[in-house]
């Protein structure tokens, strides 16, 4: 059997990137910072309705709804136009989902939170 050489190459690249960026501890720290920033905004106002209870929240996939669900399609359209794509929730659950994987930067989460604040001011 021939090993999956491309898969091995990609793993090597990912492992090197992890090592150069603080290892697993660095990745965990960055991911917590990103999710904490977003959850702080979600918890700040009744405009946003996070799905998960605080003790069960994910650091990778943050899901929520808007208290007035008729605004969700507007939020998603406006977010896409602002360069914040891929926020549509799971097809079975709906709502909004931000996936904060390792490649997602803290600056992109800050941009999302800023957009959310502006959206709430306009529609809240």
Where do the model's predicted regions map?
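A short linear hydrophobic-aromatic micro-motif
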Residues: 47-51, 83-89
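Predominant activation on well-ordered alpha-helical scaffold segments within soluble catalytic domains
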Residues: 8-16, 36-39, 73-76, 110-113
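Conserved PLP-binding catalytic core of the aspartate aminotransferase-like
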Residues: 48-79
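Conserved PLP-dependent catalytic core of the aminotransferase class-I/II
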Residues: 15-51, 77
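PLP-dependent enzyme catalytic core of the Aspartate aminotransferase-like
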Residues: 81, 90, 94-124
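Short, glycine/charged-rich beta-strand-loop motifs at protein surfaces that mediate ligand recognition
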Residues: 61-66, 85-86, 99
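A short glycine-threonine-serine/GTX helix/turn-capping micro-motif
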Residues: 1-4
């Amino acid at each position: 059997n021939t090993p999956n050489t491309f898969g091995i190459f990609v793993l090597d690249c990912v492992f090197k990137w992890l090592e150069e960026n603080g290892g697993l501890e660095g990745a965990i720290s960055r991911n917590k910072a990103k999710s904490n920033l977003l959850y702080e905004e979600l918890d700040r106002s009744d405009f946003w309705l996070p799905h998960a209870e605080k003790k069960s929240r994910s650091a990778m996939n943050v899901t929520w709804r808007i208290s007035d669900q008729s605004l969700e399609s507007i939020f998603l359209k406006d977010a896409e136009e602002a360069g914040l794509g891929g926020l549509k929730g799971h097809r079975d659950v709906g709502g909004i989902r931000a996936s904060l994987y390792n490649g997602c930067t803290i600056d992109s989460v800050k941009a999302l939170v800023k957009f959310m604040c502006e959206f709430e001011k306009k529609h809240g």
